């Protein structure tokens, strides 16, 4: 085991021990994980800001770096299926297991290890609100307009540079009907649940019509009706129904246009339609601008000797940096298939590969 990997594992064990589950959005700026990170970054100018509701950012700079590394420190809640305490990291022959080791405290530990392996220029932005779908930390950073050639956002990409991914939009719909006995002939709009079912059929047909759309190796529109609530009992016409759905567009797709199309499948007089969250695609912008930004990110990956991976379906905050005008890519250790799972793990080989690469970027010739 190399010294870099040993140092990474030491820091990772400590980072895992801090409870940063989100929700409940209870991560504090003082004490805990942020005090630990501050203490591990001697020689850095460190700024910790509490943005409220568990959103805390730590911005650390040494020298005049060209690149910013961004890592979120919050994790999803643990499930009942963990076989041991999720906040006690376990080591096996080829991996470590613990809540957040893959998504994505392993990257944070590696960056701290690399920072302490030399005195090269470096900039880190650690945040605690990525899992909350309320990106206050990134929004506050973008408002400052600090100059960087590129931002490398850590998420599990098998230590390959990801240049493109889907956006995400979440929508709440409410349908209004008229209560009554189910034995009689119904007006088609009487049942709120029937309205929701008809809307779902039209929406699914539209999604199928987009199956052949492509961008950067991605195909089609990802769409999911995640929840439908409503009605009282089988012999009563449902007076109200609520439906929640989400979709993940290609970078080349017009999100506002898609929302208008989905909204148009319902009677506006009987349905409420509200987008509750939107994350842009990576790269952001129209087709021409997105392709220009993708090529710029590819040039950065090539300059840093990072292997380039395929575009991915999952969303990351790299898209927020892209929308804010930065060249951005996603790069981190581990497999996304392990994120959010019981007994989450990352392999030692992945941590080794990542820490060596960021050490080279920080302390090498880049």
Swiss-Prot record:
CDD domains hit by this protein: M20_ArgE
Source organism superkingdom: Bacteria
GO molecular function list: acetylornithine deacetylase activity; cobalt ion binding; N-acetylcitrulline deacetylase activity
The entry's keywords: Amino-acid biosynthesis, Arginine biosynthesis, Cobalt, Hydrolase, Metal-binding
InterPro entries: ACDase_ArgE'-like, Bact_exopeptidase_dim_dom, Peptidase_M20, Peptidase_M20_dimer, Peptidase_M20A
Catalytic reaction annotation: N(2)-acetyl-L-citrulline + H2O = L-citrulline + acetate; N(2)-acetyl-L-ornithine + H2O = L-ornithine + acetate
GO biological process entries: L-arginine biosynthetic process
Cofactor note (record): Binds 1 Co(2+) ion per subunit.
Record-linked NCBIfam families: PRK08737.1 (NF006439)
Family stated for the protein in its record: Belongs to the peptidase M20A family. N-acetylcitrulline deacetylase subfamily.
Quaternary organization: Forms homodimers in the crystal, but higher order oligomers may form in solution.
UniProt protein name: N-acetyl-L-citrulline deacetylase
């Amino acid at each position: 085991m190399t010294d870099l990997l040993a140092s990474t594992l030491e820091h990772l064990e400590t980072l895992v021990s801090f409870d940063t589950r989100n929700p409940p959005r209870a991560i504090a700026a003082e004490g805990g994980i942020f005090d630990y990170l501050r203490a591990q970054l001697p020689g850095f100018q460190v700024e910790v800001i509490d943005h409220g509701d568990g959103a805390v950012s730590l911005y650390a700079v040494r020298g005049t770096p060209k690149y910013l590394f961004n890592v979120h420190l919050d994790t999803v809640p643990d499930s009942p299926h963990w076989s041991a305490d999720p906040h006690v990291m376990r080591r096996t022959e080829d991996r470590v297991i613990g809540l957040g080791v893959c998504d994505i405290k392993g990257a944070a530990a590696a960056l701290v290890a690399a920072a302490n392996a030399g005195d090269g220029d470096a900039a880190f932005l650690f945040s605690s609100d990525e899992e909350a779908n309320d990106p206050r930390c990134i929004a506050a950073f973008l408002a400052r307009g600090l100059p960087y050639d590129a931002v490398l956002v850590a998420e599990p990409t098998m230590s390959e540079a990801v240049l493109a991914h889907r956006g995400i939009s979440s929508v709440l719909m409410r349908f209004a009907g008229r209560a009554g006995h189910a034995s009689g002939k119904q007006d088609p709009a009487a049942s709120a649940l029937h309205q929701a079912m008809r809307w779902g059929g039209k929406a699914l047909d539209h999604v199928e019509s987009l199956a052949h759309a492509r961008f950067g190796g991605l195909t089609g529109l990802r769409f999911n009706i995640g929840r439908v609530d409503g009605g009282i009992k089988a012999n009563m016409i449902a007076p109200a129904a609520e439906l929640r759905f989400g979709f993940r567009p290609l970078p080349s797709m017009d999100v506002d246009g898609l929302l208008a199309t989905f909204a148009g499948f319902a009677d506006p007089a009987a349905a409420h339609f509200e987008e509750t969250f939107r994350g842009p695609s990576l790269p952001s912008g129209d087709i021409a601008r997105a392709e220009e930004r993708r090529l710029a990110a590819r040039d950065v990956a090539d300059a840093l000797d990072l292997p380039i991976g395929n575009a991915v379906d999952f969303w990351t905050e790299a898209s927020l940096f892209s929308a804010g005008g930065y060249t951005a890519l996603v790069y981190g250790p581990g497999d996304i298939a392990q994120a959010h799972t019981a007994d989450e793990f990352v392999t030692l080989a992945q941590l080794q590969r990542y820490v060596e690469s960021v050490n080279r970027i920080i302390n090498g010739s880049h």
